Amino acid sequence: MAYLNNSFDEEAQSFGAFCARALLENACAALVGRLDSFRMLYLAEFQAQGAYEYGKPTKSGFKWTGDVFSEDKPLATLWNSDHDSSKVSRALFSPHVDAVLWQPAFNEALDYLADECLSGFEEISTMEAVSFISAAKGRCGPLYSKLSKGVHWDFFVASVMMDEGTLKDAIRDCLTVVSNLAFISHFIPTCYRSLDRAQAATEYLAFRETFQ
């Protein structure tokens, strides 16, 4: 947050993208864990084994493509008795998770905001349930790639390093999409550790005030 709200300096230019991508990844991982607790419990148990190796890639480890974004191409039809259930993605942004969890929750959130006449939710209120997750995917994908260039340090020429506007816009986009997802998640009845709706709204507004 300091890299966004404070004056731009060399430290922000060097580490801002790294911190923002870490936030994006960890926030999405937390949402995966709250929606699919077995996935997190499996990872925790797997990593607790004595054979776990830090320097070796793990096929079952948490992955951006697989846990957040679906690995496979979308199915032509979501609901078909011929689908192999083992191949139905449970990724955070998968079409099935969107249809079963995110879209009903988004409609619940809109109804709550309308009933309570709450302000400060204009961005969410202008969206539609059917496009909420597709919009989040559309922001998270390019954002992840942009921030990754700062993490892996693709900038070998000073002229292409992120300037203040580019970096701060990326950080702001990251905080915005994460806060929107987090707020809607509290309207998913099966989501672990959901806040009371009033508290979720209060926390959302307080968080948004820190960077708007």
Regions inferred by a protein language model and the residue ranges of each:
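Residue-level recognition of alpha-helical structural elements
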Residues: D9-A12, G16, A136, V160-D163, ...
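Charged/polar positions within long, soluble alpha-helices
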Residues: C28-D36, S145-S159, S179-T190
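Non-cleavable N-terminal signal-anchor transmembrane helices
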Residues: K59, F211-Q212
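Amphipathic, Lys/Arg-enriched alpha-helical patches that create a basic surface
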Residues: C117, S134-S145, E164-F211
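Short non-catalytic regulatory patches outside canonical folded cores
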Residues: R21, C28-K137
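Histidine-centered, metal-coordinating catalytic motifs and their short helical/loop contexts
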Residues: E122-T126, V130-S159
